[in-house]
């Protein structure tokens, strides 16, 4: 029913780490997946990826555009006694949907799983 390659791509993409300013991981996943569907792939210094699929006719042309980053947060404080973190959003976020959200905190020593409470 569904293309297994497409399902695996979406799984890898949604599980990748890509908040604003750190889009390299999801960009690499998209680039790898799309190269088999494109005649040309260009990635600029800012991380934008352009895929070109050449058609047979001059018109019409279609542009599909989107962003590759996800909403993230920056840790702004750590309570040494409880281990609770305070944080500020990077990008837009709806405060009312934060409770019970699973998060990944990327540190110099590796990723840490957490839940917003």
Regions found by a protein language model. Give the residues of each.
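N-terminal hydrophobic/helix-forming segments and targeting peptides
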Residues: 1-117
């Amino acid at each position: 029913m569904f293309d297994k390659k497409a399902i695996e791509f979406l799984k890898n993409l949604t599980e990748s780490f890509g908040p604003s300013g750190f889009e390299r991981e999801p960009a690499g996943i998209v680039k790898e997946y799309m190269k088999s569907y494109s005649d040309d792939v260009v990635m600029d210094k800012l991380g934008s990826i352009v895929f070109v699929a050449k058609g047979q006719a001059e018109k019409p042309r279609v542009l599909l555009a989107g962003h590759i980053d996800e909403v993230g947060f920056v840790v702004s404080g750590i309570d040494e006694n409880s281990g609770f973190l305070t944080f500020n959003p990077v990008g837009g976020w709806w405060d009312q949907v934060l409770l019970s959200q699973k998060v990944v905190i990327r540190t110099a020593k590796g990723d840490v799983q957490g839940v917003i409470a």
